[in-house]
Amino acid sequence: MDIQWYQPTATSHSYEPFADLVMDEYSRLLPAPNRFPSSADGKGFAPLAEYVHSLGLKFGIHIMRGIPRQAVFMNAKIKDSKYTARQVAQYNNICYWNPDMYGTDTNCPGAADYYNSIFELYASWGVDFVKVDDICRNYNNEGEIKLIRNAIDNCGRDMVLSLSPGPARIEQAEFLKENANMWRITDDFWDKWELLYDMFTRAETWCNHAGAGHWPDCDMLPIGPINQDYSKDNRSAFTHDEQQTMMSLWCMVRSPLIIGGEMNGFDDFTMSLLTNEELLNIERDTHCAHMVTRKVVDGNEQIIWLAPAKDASVNYVALFNAGESVCDITVDIARLGIKPTNAYDIWNFTTEAVGDKLTATVNPHGVRLFKLL
């Protein structure tokens, strides 16, 4: 459930400053019943979460860090606390793009009481995933991240904690691994080649920090219909080659795969990006992925990544062409210290014998992705 589910008059992607939000007596935002009828009479998202769970899926919500400004103006109570919203709020700590919240004064015990109370509420609804926004790229938000982590740990329900937006700082890597499950390594990612090209550098920076329970997040996959009206004509501006490059890189880095398009409008090609089992095996079953080489050859930038399977049974190699023309890319397999006999082309579903070297013709902005057997 994305941003501002508590705002009854929301009609677009624009925010309405200082709108009347749906909130309980304890400063906790609630779903707007006019938009989510099942939430009426204090039920919150519990009925919707129950339905989602009945489908075999997990239920997640988006929240902004901090305490509602509306609660501060009202000096509302905080559940199980002697402190009020005004005592918890940090008035000079605000989000520059969303008007709903004040940051909290983490030196005030009431801030912990507030975060404990909202995650207690989310646990009662059956929430499995929480994306906390306006918290990841700010240098000074470690205190609130710790309060959120503690609140989740004490709420009685397992929840995935995702921090946004990026770019997160590599200097915070160990802190983020200890306190979050996902964190954005980039600002909002859209269907522009320059953003995808930049991701190669970000991926190299963060790849060593992906592991069980903690994942650098390259952001959503802008595939299929992605504009605000989700018209089938407003499809991703990425070429097919660029979309395969994106999927290959995200899986090599083992970034969370978050669909950013309207699924009802997906065509066969878009579905093929998400249902390629060998590709998804890279996401699930590899570790220690890393860039092998990055160099310019005859005017085309060539980037090679390697990802070994956790059980060392196979290796995956990605040959990326970041240039503007078709080129041949060669990887010296012998120098990688592995001895495969066959290479399975994951996007083209073909197998070829392989020796000490593997050469593939790669389209501009494209990739050839191989499973080495």
Predicted regions and their residues:
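C-terminal beta-strand-rich structural cap/linker in extracellular carbohydrate-active enzymes
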Residues: 354-373
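Solvent-exposed beta-hairpin/edge-strand motifs
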Residues: 334-349
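Aromatic-lined carbohydrate-binding/catalytic grooves of carbohydrate-active enzymes
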Residues: 1-51, 55-123, 127-134, 138
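Glycan-recognition surfaces
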Residues: 88-93, 105-107, 113, 154, ...
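Catalytic cores of secreted or luminal carbohydrate-active enzymes
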Residues: 245-294
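Extracytoplasmic, non-cytosolic globular domains
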Residues: 121-167
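Active-site-proximal beta-strand/loop segments in catalytic clefts of secreted hydrolases
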Residues: 1-4, 62-67, 132-136, 161-167, ...
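Carbohydrate-binding surface patches
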Residues: 244, 250-253, 258-260, 297-337, ...
